[in-house]
């Protein structure tokens, strides 16, 4: 069974794409578990009318030890973060930078979800900003790409992407800002002019992208059993 929902925008709000102010951001973490892992770096770039108007970046001192595997991936060591602010200390700067602008992340279900869990952990409400997942948007806009990692999408738009600098929050946020600017151009070229339009877009190759979900089906009688075998 394939999940038909391809959510691009969370916390939907009407906003014109033509003069959109957005914040692209990225996190580096000690791992993938929102319950057990911590943020080690935050990076964000703010764009208005296609031009950068601000950026923010900081290493974050996690409570958890950074493993060698994560250091190999992000190039962030335990020594790098020993004098960095904790996430509790840095949260006010993140929220001040976001304001109420649209935020963009590549695989927002992870980055926004992780950040929301951290906010709740320290007594803050979850983000109410419209949050755009550029990964899901790429599925819809660029159905013929062979891969949808940020580097693949950047190279499609001829935006330089250095694999050695990848997996650093400030670098990925900067690349994502350029990618999303190009996506906005493509959206308007295709007749989409508002943030609210993105969720309504079709995903041509949905069956190739979304992982199948496990489902249990109960047949109550022989007729149901016969019909069930027609599904598989």
Language model: regions and residue ranges:
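Phosphodiester-processing cores and adjacent nucleic acid-binding clamps
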Residues: 23, 97, 108-109, 113-232
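Conserved non-catalytic scaffold segment of RNase H-like nuclease domains
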Residues: 1-128, 143-157, 162-163, 167
């Amino acid at each position: 069974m394939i999940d038909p929902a391809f959510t691009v925008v969370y916390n939907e709000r009407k906003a014109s794409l033509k003069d959109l102010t957005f914040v692209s951001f990225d996190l580096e973490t000690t791992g993938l578990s929102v319950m057990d892992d911590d943020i080690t770096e935050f990076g964000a770039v703010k764009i208005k009318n296609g031009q950068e108007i601000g950026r923010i970046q900081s290493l974050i001192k996690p409570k958890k030890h950074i493993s060698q595997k994560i250091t190999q991936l992000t190039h962030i060591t335990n020594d790098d973060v020993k004098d960095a602010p904790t996430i509790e200390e840095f949260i006010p700067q993140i929220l001040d930078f976001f304001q109420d602008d649209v935020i963009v992340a590549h695989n927002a279900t992870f980055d926004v979800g992780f950040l929301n869990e951290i906010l709740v952990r320290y007594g803050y409400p979850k983000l109410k900003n419209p949050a755009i997942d550029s990964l899901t948007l790429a599925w819809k806009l660029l159905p013929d790409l062979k891969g949808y990692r940020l580097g693949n999408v950047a190279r499609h738009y001829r935006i330089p992407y250095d694999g050695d600098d990848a997996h650093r929050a400030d670098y990925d946020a900067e690349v994502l800002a350029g990618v999303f600017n190009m996506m906005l151009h493509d959206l308007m070229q295709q007749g989409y002019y508002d943030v609210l339009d993105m969720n309504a877009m079709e995903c041509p190759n949905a069956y190739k992208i979304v992982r199948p979900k496990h489902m249990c089906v109960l047949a109550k009688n022989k007729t149901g059993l016969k019909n069930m075998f027609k599904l598989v």
